[in-house]
Amino acid sequence: KDVVLLNLIGVRVVLVHGGGPEISEMLEKVGKESVFLNGLRCTDDETMDIVQMVLCGKVNKNLVSMLQKAGGRGVGLAGVDGNLFEAVRRDEEHGNVGNIVDVHPEIVLDVLEKGYIPVVSSIAAGVDQTMNYNINADFAAEKLAIALHAKKFILLTDVKGLMRDFRDEDSLIREVKMSQVPGLM
């Protein structure tokens, strides 16, 4: 409801989401183990299919529906739509996990211009357009905020917060300036 209210008073809100718990739940349903390395999901081809189904389908459309039930007007997008996010493979160990190297925010700007709330899933097209990549939603949100020259960046998460060391809850960073974010990645 807060997002809808912000939109109604003229604040241009963009939602970027992941769906880790929902992906893990679906993987479990199909008998596939979730594997993580350095806090990121290792994503082979089969896992990537499930990641895309869950993020671009279930999670994205549920968020759009929630916005609309609250009186907002949401539009679901994936990072591959309009070539929004372009990525390269992070490394071999993580499989189809990518790092965003370019952002083309025109589709998001078009949606915002029409008064809708863009809801973006964190899937990116490969630079060579031969495959898609699973992108950490926090990283995708940061890259999009920079490309949009966002005045505010609000991170909603199911974890305690931004950590200097993700394994150490005492390393929580309570406040950060946008200019400091790249150095934390």
Language-model features, listed with the residues they occupy:
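Nucleotide/pyrophosphate-binding catalytic subdomain
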Residues: 1-185
